[in-house]
Amino acid sequence: MTIEDLSKQVRKIREEKGLTQYNIWKQGMNFGTVIAIESGKNVSLKNFLKYCEIVGIDVTLEEKE
């Protein structure tokens, strides 16, 4: 999965939950960071995880086979 794939997926989930980028910003995330995450730009893992927490996305890791 690429960064672009991740960005499309998290945006899709946000939209399905009826949340806007403004809603994410209101929860304390920099608006530019929200745009960067959803545009597939490189962001810190800390910011990505914060975005996922706000949206309600569970991030899990699986060992590659």
Where in this protein do the model-derived segments appear?
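DNA major-groove recognition helix of helix-turn-helix/homeodomain DNA-binding modules
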Residues: K46-E62
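The alpha-helix within a helix-turn-helix
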Residues: R14, I24-W25, C52
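Short alpha-helical DNA-recognition segment
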Residues: G18-I35
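A short, Lys/Arg-rich alpha-helix, primarily the initiator
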Residues: M1-E16
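DNA-recognition element of transcription regulators
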Residues: N42
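Helix-turn-helix DNA-binding elements, focusing on the entry/boundary residues of the two helices
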Residues: V10, T20-Q21, L45-F48
